Amino acid sequence: MAYVRLTSLAVLFFLAASVMLNVKKTEGGEFLKCGESCVQGECYTPGCSCDWPICKKNHIIATNAKTVNQHRLLCESHEDCFKKGTGNYCAFFPDSDVHFGWCFYAESDGYLLKDFFKMSKDNLKMPMTIIN
């Protein structure tokens, strides 16, 4: 009786291991990793955006896009972000296969970092001269 239980446990373990090893691993992980569907065009998981009807990782949306007009946050230059009104900075992904960047507001994100690190507001200003 114990032999049957042990055998069924071994078979179950083998099936689980084979399924886990067959999952294709990509650089950015699964595109469904956000784990939610779009609610009124919004995704609440950080690093995810709505690609109706599901939320996808931002770099997956940028990889699959053919033009910058396919998503409101895609850009090729800072000017694209200004024109769309979705930010003032176009940041490109470190993966060279992604030809588009992602728009965001550089100053507002800087203030969020300031609050996170509890820095003073003056630390974000660019120095006018270099002091040796």
UniProtKB/Swiss-Prot annotation:
InterPro entries: Albumin_I_a (IPR032000), Cyclotide (IPR005535), Cyclotide_sf (IPR036146). There is a cross-link at G29-N58 (Cyclopeptide (Gly-Asn)). Expressed in flower, stem, shoot and pod but not in root, leaf, seed and nodule (at protein level). Disulfide bonds join C34-C48, C38-C50, C43-C55. It comes from the Eukaryota. This is a cyclic peptide. Keywords: Disulfide bond, Knottin, Plant defense, Signal. Residues 59-132 form a propeptide. Residues 1-28 form the signal peptide. GO terms for biological process: defense response. Probably participates in a plant defense mechanism. Not active against Gram-negative bacteria E.coli ATCC 700926, K.pneumoniae ATTC 13883 and P.aeruginosa ATCC 39018 at concentration up to 100 uM. Has cytotoxic but no hemolytic activity. The presence of a 'disulfide through disulfide knot' structurally defines this protein as a knottin. Belongs to the cyclotide family. Moebius subfamily. This is Cliotide T2. It comes from Clitoria ternatea (Butterfly pea).
